[in-house]
């Protein structure tokens, strides 16, 4: 199966559009979170992967998730997930949906990974650079440390990854030399 984020994106975008239209963004986010929790269960996964089970049975199982959204739209979404065998991407759909909600609120979530922990001055500099890069948006900054980067930073937000690490530069050089 294709990368789950890639598979999830059109579903998340369509659901977000529907939710926004009806003013039920949070209710849909909650429903997706509950659905992802159910699908994470080993027994539910066994049921959903059982080739002897009809799609209607699988939709019925997933319909047991209590939701505060339009039931007809919810069941249509579940039927689509089952029919297209996209239920494994449910957690990613929920994540992308939540990302869309935050973007609509003007917030960009950014993960900054560095080889060593950033000091206060470095954090301020990175935060300022990110706010310039994402002008008009509030930047929610998270930090991680990965010594394998050797030095520099990797900045990740949504589909955008900026690899300014020593490891990334070495890998790029190796690819260039091989070609």
Curated annotation (Swiss-Prot):
Localization, UniProt: Cell inner membrane
The UniProt record lists the keyword Protease: no
GO molecular function, one term: proton-transporting ATP synthase activity, rotational mechanism
Matching Gene3D superfamilies: N-terminal domain of the delta subunit of the F1F0-ATP synthase
Keywords, alphabetical: ATP synthesis, Cell inner membrane, Cell membrane, CF(1), Hydrogen ion transport, Ion transport, Membrane, Transport
HAMAP family per UniProt: ATP_synth_delta_bact
Role, per record: F(1)F(0) ATP synthase produces ATP from ADP in the presence of a proton or sodium gradient. F-type ATPases consist of two structural domains, F(1) containing the extramembraneous catalytic core and F(0) containing the membrane proton channel, linked together by a central stalk and a peripheral stalk. During catalysis, ATP synthesis in the catalytic domain of F(1) is coupled via a rotary mechanism of the central stalk subunits to proton translocation. This protein is part of the stalk that links CF(0) to CF(1). It either transmits conformational changes from CF(0) to CF(1) or is implicated in proton conduction.
UniProt protein name: ATP synthase subunit delta
Gene field: atpH
